[in-house]
């Protein structure tokens, strides 16, 4: 998907159209894990964000990486955001069943647990209505195409707009 059809670009359009002065800084890296997010979060904080959309973990799940390590990485990112007074919108992810039911259950439980523990605004599943829907994804059934990014943008906006009003 070209940059202007990506969800960060679409989100910027929604923000501007609603009259908010906020600027989206796309710190996402395709294929990245929560460990990569830990390495990048200090750079992100140099932009002095008011709000961080924390949407990491899907690639940890695709690779079958340790759920405990993912949780620890997300906790580190949350702590650093809090040190810089950035509010957080946490987007949940789902795991594929190929690593077994226990892994899937443990993986998916991390996101609501962290949202509750840290009192975060929470979007239960970033790709709701997109993942597994061939008309909204690349042939892998996971990565969104333009129509999928439109859905993702709307999902994020429902949680983000009230945060922008505060």
Per-range role (PLM):
Residues 1-7:
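Glycine- and acidic-residue-enriched helix-capping/strand-helix junction motifs
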Residues 9-20, 36-166:
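Alpha-helical cap/lid subdomain in secreted, periplasmic
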Residues 20-33:
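A short beta-strand-loop structural module common to alpha/beta enzyme folds
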Residues 2, 29-32, 65, 144:
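Short, surface-exposed alpha-helical recognition segments that flank or form part
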């Amino acid at each position: 998907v070209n940059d202007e059809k990506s969800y960060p670009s679409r989100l910027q359009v929604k923000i501007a159209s609603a009259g908010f002065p906020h600027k989206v800084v796309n710190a996402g890296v395709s294929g990245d894990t929560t460990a990569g997010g830990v390495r990048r979060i200090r750079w992100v904080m140099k932009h002095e964000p008011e709000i961080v959309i924390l949407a990491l973990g899907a690639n940890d799940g695709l690779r079958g990486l340790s759920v405990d390590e993912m949780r620890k990485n997300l906790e580190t990112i949350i702590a650093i955001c809090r040190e810089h007074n950035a509010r957080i919108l946490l987007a949940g992810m789902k795991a594929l069943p190929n690593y077994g039911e226990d892994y899937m259950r443990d993986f998916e439980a991390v996101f609501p647990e962290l949202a509750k523990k840290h009192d975060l605004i929470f979007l239960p599943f970033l790709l709701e209505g997109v993942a597994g829907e061939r008309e909204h994804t690349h042939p892998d059934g996971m990565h969104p195409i333009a129509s999928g990014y439109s859905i993702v943008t709307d999902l994020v906006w429902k949680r983000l707009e009230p945060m922008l009003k505060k």
